[in-house]
C-alpha cells in the first residue's frame, strides 16, 4: 500500500503523476487478494495535496463492500490502508484518516473483520468495541491494528523500533503476535487474542452487597 512518502516531493510530478513510480514497482495502488480463506482489499488513503493527512472516498468504500460481499462466507475479510484509524495515546498529534468514524463504520457495515494500517510507526491494537459505543448489530467483532515500522527508526524519534505483526486466524479467534527487532534477531514481545464473528457483549454478574450466599 502506498504511504505519504511514496509520492514525489517535486512539483508538478506530485500532482500530475503521483503514483507513476509506485505503480512501476507494484502495479497498483489498490491491490486485491482473494486467497484460500482470506480476502484482502487495499485502500489508497494518500492524497497528493496533503502530505500527512489521509482520506478514503465513498467510491473506495463501495468497492470494499462489493469485494467482501462476493467473498465466501468463511473467508476472513481484511481492509488495509496506510493512514491509521486509531493511534497510540502518546502520538495524539497524529490525526487519523479523515472522517475516521464514518470510514470505520462503513468498513464494519461491509463485513470487515480486520482493519490494518500504519503511518505512526508504533504498534497499537484494539477491538472496535473498546473505543466505540455499541450500536444495534455491534456484537460482531472487528479488530483494528496499527503495525509498527519495519524499517530503521527515524533519528531523534524516541519510542520507535523495528517491528511487525503476525496474524493467525482460526474459526472464532484471531491471534496477533508482535515481534520487535533486537540486535541478535526478532523477539516475540506480545501475544493478543481477539474474538472473530458474532459475540454478544459479556457483563460480569456481581453479587449485591449483603446478599445471602
What are these regions (language model features)?
Residues 1-66, 71, 105-108, 132-133, ...:
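Extended active-site neighborhood of metal-dependent phosphoesterases/phosphodiesterases
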Residues 4-6, 45-46, 83-84, 118-120, ...:
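Active-site metal-binding loops of divalent metal-dependent hydrolases
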Residues 11-13, 51-56, 90-95, 155-158:
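Short, solvent-exposed loop/turn segments at secondary-structure boundaries
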Residues 37-47, 78-82, 142-149:
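Active-site-proximal beta-strand elements of phosphoester/diester hydrolases
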Residues 72-88:
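Short acidic, glycine-rich surface-loop motifs adjacent to enzyme active sites
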Residues 73-76, 112, 173:
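A general structural motif
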Residues 93-170:
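Conserved beta-sheet core of the metallophosphoesterase superfamily
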Residues 168-213:
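A short C-terminal boundary segment appended to hydrolase-like catalytic domains
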Amino acid at each position: 500500500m502506498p504511504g505519504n512518502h511514496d509520492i514525489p516531493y517535486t512539483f508538478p510530478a506530485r500532482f500530475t503523476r503521483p503514483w507513476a513510480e509506485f505503480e512501476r514497482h507494484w502495479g497498483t495502488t489498490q491491490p486485491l487478494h482473494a486467497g484460500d480463506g482470506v480476502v484482502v482489499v487495499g485502500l489508497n488513503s494518500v492524497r497528493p495535496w496533503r502530505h500527512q493527512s489521509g482520506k478514503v472516498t465513498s467510491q473506495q468504500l463501495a468497492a470494499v463492500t462489493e469485494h467482501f460481499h462476493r467473498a465466501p462466507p468463511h473467508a476472513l475479510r481484511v481492509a488495509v490502508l496506510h493512514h491509521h484509524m486509531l493511534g497510540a495515546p502518546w502520538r495524539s498529534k497524529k490525526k487519523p484518516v479523515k472522517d475516521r468514524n464514518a470510514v470505520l463504520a462503513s468498513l464494519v457495515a461491509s463485513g470487515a473483520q480486520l482493519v490494518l494500517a500504519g503511518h505512526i510507526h508504533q504498534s497499537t491494537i484494539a477491538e472496535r468495541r473498546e473505543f466505540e459505543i455499541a450500536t444495534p448489530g455491534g456484537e460482531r467483532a472487528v479488530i483494528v491494528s496499527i503495525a509498527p515500522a519495519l524499517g530503521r527508526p527515524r533519528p531523534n524519534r524516541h519510542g520507535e523500533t523495528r517491528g511487525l505483526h503476525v496474524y493467525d486466524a482460526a474459526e472464532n479467534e484471531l491471534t496477533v503476535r508482535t515481534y520487535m527487532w533486537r540486535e541478535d534477531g526478532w523477539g516475540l514481545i506480545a501475544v493478543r487474542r481477539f474474538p472473530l464473528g458474532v459475540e454478544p457483549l459479556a457483563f460480569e454478574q456481581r453479587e449485591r452487597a449483603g446478599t445471602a450466599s
